[in-house]
């Protein structure tokens, strides 16, 4: 594996262990050229997914992009980082097992929202505000009121 610090291709694995409930392998690596240490994760990839945007544009699925958007929604929430990793792995496995390699971005967004709703409602609302492109406070108000249908509006 290429060293991210100096580009040397001869790095050494110093430690390997299971991660994310045994669906990934965490490897600590060392670069003898520059002394750099870094961590890599190895995961099973069932198939190469392609995201189909609403504009029709297609791009390769990027787990890092999915992870970034979920971590932004989960920022400063009392959720363990391992739980977030498990959630992301679960979403990716679900996408890979759908049977088609072309996945509409809308489907990905809905799966993420469905998953977040079960884990943390604040993160769910945060993600939804970006995904559904909220423009005003009324958009938040309407969305949150739909979360609590039993409440009577004043």
Curated annotation (Swiss-Prot):
The keyword Lipid biosynthesis does not apply. Binds 1 zinc ion. Keywords: ATP-binding, DNA-binding, Metal-binding, Nucleotide-binding, Repressor, Transcription, Transcription regulation, Zinc, Zinc-finger. A zinc finger (unnamed) spans 3-34. It comes from Paracoccus denitrificans (strain Pd 1222). Coiled coil: none annotated. InterPro entries: ATP-cone_dom, NrdR-like_N, RNR_NrdR-like. One of its GO terms (molecular function) is ATP binding. The keyword Cell inner membrane does not apply. Belongs to the NrdR family. Negatively regulates transcription of bacterial ribonucleotide reductase nrd genes and operons by binding to NrdR-boxes. Residues 49-139 form the ATP-cone domain. It comes from the Bacteria. This is Transcriptional repressor NrdR. Its cofactor is Zn(2+). GO terms for biological process: negative regulation of DNA-templated transcription. Pfam families: ATP-cone, Zn_ribbon_NrdR.
């Amino acid at each position: 594996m290429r060293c991210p610090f100096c580009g040397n291709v001869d790095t050494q694995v110093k430690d390997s262990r299971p991660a994310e409930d045994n669906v990934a392998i965490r490897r600590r690596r060392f670069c003898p050229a520059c002394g750099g240490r870094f961590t890599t994760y190895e995961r099973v990839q069932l198939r190469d997914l392609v995201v189909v945007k609403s504009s029709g544009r297609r791009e390769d699925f990027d787990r890092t992009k999915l992870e970034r958007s979920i971590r932004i929604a989960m920022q400063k929430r009392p959720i363990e980082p391992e739980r977030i990793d498990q959630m992301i792995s679960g979403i990716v496995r679900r996408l890979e097992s759908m049977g088609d390699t072309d996945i509409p971005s809308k489907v990905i967004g809905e799966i993420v929202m469905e998953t977040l709703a079960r884990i943390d409602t604040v993160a769910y609302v945060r993600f939804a505000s970006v995904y559904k492109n909220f423009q005003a406070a009324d958009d938040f108000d309407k969305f949150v009121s739909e979360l609590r249908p039993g409440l009577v509006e004043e």
